[in-house]
Every structure is written in structure tokens, then in C-alpha cells.
Amino acid sequence: MEDGVLKEGFLVKRGHIVHNWKARWFILRQNTLVYYKLEGGRRVTPPKGRILLDGCTITCPCLEYENRPLLIKLKTQTSTEYFLEACSREERDAWAFEITGAIHAGQPGKVQQLHSLRNSFKLPPHISLHRIVDKMHDSNTGIRSSPNMEQGSTYKKTFLGSSLVDWLISNSFTASRLEAVTLASMLMEENFLRPVGVRSMGAIRSGDLAEQFLDDSTALYTFAESYKKKISPKEEISLSTVELSGTVVKQGYLAKQGHKRKNWKVRRFVLRKDPAFLHYYDPSKEENRPVGGFSLRGSLVSALEDNGVPTGVKGNVQGNLFKVITKDDTHYYIQASSKAERAEWIEAIKKLT
């Protein structure tokens, strides 16, 4: 990483004039967040834009876009709004932490205050659990329930543990994720919520009160009164649901060479096990459906040379490249943002081939 760089990587940014979404390479420094367009695996200079962080306000989680739950919102002193989407909750929170630190760099006490997690949480006297549940049911601003898959079974009208934590913070019921977990646990204890599926039920059985509600994107919950028996996987099944039913092992933004036009585009890659699949999504699209993917059984993965353009790669694309050859001899050329990231992806994929 260059001197003075606090964090860098891909984020998906909403356009100012036309509200489309495009992947950009962001570099965070002490007082600015700069973003670049990428062409042929390289960032195009000069930068596409620069966000001055002095006087900025940050909203995270930001739930203004229903189909984009991993957003950070920045509002500058001139009231310009930026919406930035990360590839995972962990990555979103890491960006938010660093950006918040950069905004308040001159006030160390403020940074400490912003990131301190309180060990105890008491519900404010003017807010009742009934009121929170009523707001959760609101058709416009409430928590969104939908069918979710876990280990091959579909559960109707459920939501993710991490989504409820985001919602509680966004609606100002709590100030931190730790407080939100405590509040969600209270909702379960009072029988407003019920765990659904192996992951969340397992946490209940563990007996550890501190970890009964999981701030996790694989743990499912539902309103107690809407609990339904799980649908048999035989009733609702297709090839894609089988492929997507595995446990997420790793996810992130990577550049990929197209099969027909050979152009390079940033995609959000999701690696799953049991069954082992690597899917990729178009981050500019609203729907959360993969645009491609393949089984890793019998696949080969290897790093490509960093000196010069490797065979099979179109254009002047060099550095941090790796290749996956599937069982049916389809070649996928992928570029990571650093050697370390490439090594992590290769190691994770190799374990599943």
C-alpha cells in the first residue's frame, strides 16, 4: 500500500446525475477519498472524483436501497450525497471504521467515542419492545421478510440476523452492533422473534446467553407468530438453488475477462462449499442473482506470471492474475487487487477442488 493510504479497494458507487451503479477503485487518505475508473485491470488517471472528508457525515448501515443492504452513505459539507456499496458486511464495516477515523482524525477522543462498544445496554424508558416490533412490521420501513435457503432447505418469511442488527441501528434503537444484538436477544426472550434453521437454533442450544442471537448473514430468524414449517427441498428446488445452498466461504470484488468479447469487468465473486461453487454477480444490477458460475469439483486453479501479459489474456492486463480451469475445460481469467488477495483466493479455491 502507498504511503499515507489508510485503505484501498473496490466499492460500487451510485452515479450523481444518472443513478446507475458502477464499480470504482477507492483510495482513502487522511482527508480525502479518491476514486478511479479501471480499464484493462489498471486504474485510469486522473481520478474520476474526489470526496473531501472534512465536515462529512457518515451513515452506516444505510438502508435507503432495499436491494443494496451493504451501503455506506457519505454527506459532504455542501450536502452532496455519495452511496458506496461493499461486497460483504465485514468489508462495509471495515470501510466505515476507517472513513470515520479519517473524518475525525483531528479529534482522537471523538474517534474513541465513536468506536467504543458499551458492555451494558438498557432500553430507553420511552421505547417499548412492542413499539419496536410494530415498526419492524411496517410495510414501508420495516424489516423485510423473504424466503431464505439454509443447507438445502427453504424457509419462508425469514430475515438474516445481520439484517436485523443493521435495521435496529439504522432506526436509532441502538448505537452499536453489540447493543443491537442485546436488544434482539431481548426480543427473542419475550417471544417476539424465533430462530429458524440449523445455525440460529444451534446458538440457542449452546446455552451461552451472550451469543444466543447471532449477528450473522447465515443465521435466520422470523416473527414468532409467522413461523411456518420449512418447505421440503423437493417442493421448491432448481439447479440454481442447489448451487446457491452452500455455505459462503469467501466473497469479494475481482476483475474477470469475458468469454466472448474478452473485455474486463469487475464482478462480486462468492465462493461456497457443500456444494463447492464459485458464482459471480454484476454489482451494477439491482437483483441479487448470479450472472455466471461453475462447479469447482475437478477444477484446477493457478497463479499466472506477473511479468508480461500471460497467454490467453486479452489486452495489456498484467499483475495479480490467476486462472481457473473447470472440469469441462472452460478457462476463467481473474484479476485480484494485490498479490496477497490473489494468494488468499487461490488457497480458498484449492481447498474445494
From Swiss-Prot:
Cited InterPro entries: DEP_dom, PH-like_dom_sf, PH_domain, Pleckstrin, PLEK2_DEP, WH-like_DNA-bd_sf, WH_DNA-bd_sf
What's the domain of life for this entry? Eukaryota
For this entry, the protein name equals Pleckstrin-2
Q: Indicate the segments forming the PH domain, all copies.
A: 4-104, 247-353
- Keywords (A to Z) from UniProt: Acetylation, Cell membrane, Cell projection, Cytoplasm, Cytoskeleton, Membrane, Phosphoprotein, Repeat
Q: Which residues carry this modification: Phosphoserine?
A: S120
Biological process GO annotation list? actin cytoskeleton organization; intracellular signal transduction; positive regulation of plasma membrane bounded cell projection assembly
Main location (coarse class): membrane
- Xref: PROSITE patterns: DEP (PS50186), PH_DOMAIN (PS50003)
User: Which SUPFAM superfamilies does its entry note?
Assistant: PH domain-like (SSF50729), Winged helix' DNA-binding domain (SSF46785)
Q: Per the database record, which ranges form the DEP domain?
A: 139-225
Q: Which SMART domains match?
A: DEP, PH
UniProt entry tagged with the keyword Transmembrane helix: no
Please name the PANTHER family in this protein's record: PLECKSTRIN, PLECKSTRIN-2
Q: Listed disulfide bonds for this chain?
A: none
